[in-house]
A protein has these predicted regions:
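Short linear sequence motif anchored by a di-proline
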Residues: 1-116
């Protein structure tokens, strides 16, 4: 499961996904990591899609110290609806994370190389 993703052409991708994109230019991102803020697409109450910024990761509402907790960044499609951590978000709080690549860091000694 990958812990980094890329969004190399955010303006084109988000304009295609969201009718409410305000047109503000966004810079390409090649190393989006957990806990970083990135653009996503959400549906408003009337169903129109809007681009908003959200922090990557899901911290359970039962966490005692959210500021020092590691967020969940992966879920298995075959069990996501059964897990307490994801169940309510899957039903009521969905979003589209615009990405055009994902990768993990491959480590060899002290050197790290991104592997797609």
């Amino acid at each position: 499961m990958c812990g980094r993703y890329t969004l190399s052409n955010p303006n084109e991708i988000l304009a295609e996904l969201a009718s409410g994109d305000d047109g503000s230019p966004l810079a390409a991102r090649y190393n989006v990591a957990p806990r970083q803020i990135a653009p996503v697409v959400v549906a408003d109450e009337d169903g129109s899609r809007q681009v908003v910024s959200m922090r990557w990761g899901l911290i359970p509402n039962w966490t005692k110290d959210p500021d020092n907790s590691l967020p969940a960044i992966n879920a298995r499609a075959e069990t996501v609806a059964e897990k307490a951590l994801f169940r309510e978000s899957l039903r009521r709080r969905r979003c589209v994370v615009a990405a055009d690549g994902f990768y993990e860091w491959y480590r060899e000694g002290r050197q790290k190389t991104p592997m797609r």
